[in-house]
Amino acid sequence: MTMKGLFIGAAMAALLSGCARTSITSTGGVQNYMPDNAVIAHRGTIYWAPELTEAAFRWARNTGADYVELDVQRSKDSVLIIMHDKTFKRTTDVAVKFPGREADPIGSFTCEEIMTLDAGSAFNKKNPDQARQIFAGQNVLVFEDVFRIAEGKRIKRNTDGTRVFTKDESGKYHFEYEADPADNGHRPGVYIETKIPDEYPGLEEQVYDELARIGWNPLVGEIPAAEEPFWKGDRVNVGNTRGKILVQTFSRPGMMNFKRVFGEKVLASFLIGNPKTNEFAKPEVTDEIIAFAKECGAPFIGTNLGDANDGLSPEFAGKIHAAGLKVNVYSFNTVEQMEKYFGPGEGKKSAPLADGMITNRTDLTVDFYNARKVRAYGTEKTPQETLADLGYNQ
């Protein structure tokens, strides 16, 4: 891979709140390419639509997420595939389409095999209150799909509902998209999580190259203007800024690979998993996590909500912030959870524990921040109305 992108530091425009965005050479640097109190749509949504599907990402975009979050793996024929689990068993009909292969890893299937899977019916079965017949037949997505949806497009389909694509003599796939007639103008960024990258050698380089190919690598080609705002009026505009992507992983080798490939010039977050009880109360544990995040050039740490004695305490949040880092927390489902992480802080009610929320309920989180006057707009429609606008009727 040839990395020719230049990242030019420049003074950035004032935010809606009046706080200045600093240049790459100033205190905070790349960290300031993300808005404070960012709403990050976890897998699009896992509540209102089948996770990581076109329906989930279109809904998150139109609901006003600042970022849509995805999980990326790789098919047998080297196509980047959007899937969280190590297998297709939980979210698709793989047991029906490919009997005996339910426990096979994602990387053992070709892209064409993957495109035959139904990624919607399992959601309907598990979530009868949110089930919609039209979700049946939702596809497992490829990497490019999510970015085109973020641009206001949708997958182009044949009359039978199958997606339009071609495959050239070299085996390379070419996917087609069209303007989404239900697009409402929000332009979110994309939060990219590599899953089990140790099992996919060169995954970080492939992500870099694919981002460059589809016009989403902020280090290649035309660099977004320093003055480009996070919002334009009441429309999200993060997807057109220098903070248009964030890369993250739980893998420590993967984090070091991100540092090598992206050169600490894009947003990055070091994910930490579920702690044992009171583990994050141990200074040696939290100090080491913070030290590694800084070593790999990640200005963000991502941690989970945890239970009463786990997760992000005021003390841990204080240490992260004192080290010059920020923390985004996953994954919110209720207003009560949001209140816990927004209200308390390091001894001050005005200092939230979480700098951003990775949420399964973008609708709730957008309105939560709006009600607390840290976001200029709330949702315009109910989640059900948004789904109907997008063509996902009952």
Give the location of each predicted region:
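Bacterial N-terminal signal peptides
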Residues: 9-17
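Bacterial N-terminal signal peptides that target proteins for export
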Residues: 1-7
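Phosphate-group recognition and catalysis centered on beta-loop-alpha active-site segments
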Residues: 19-394
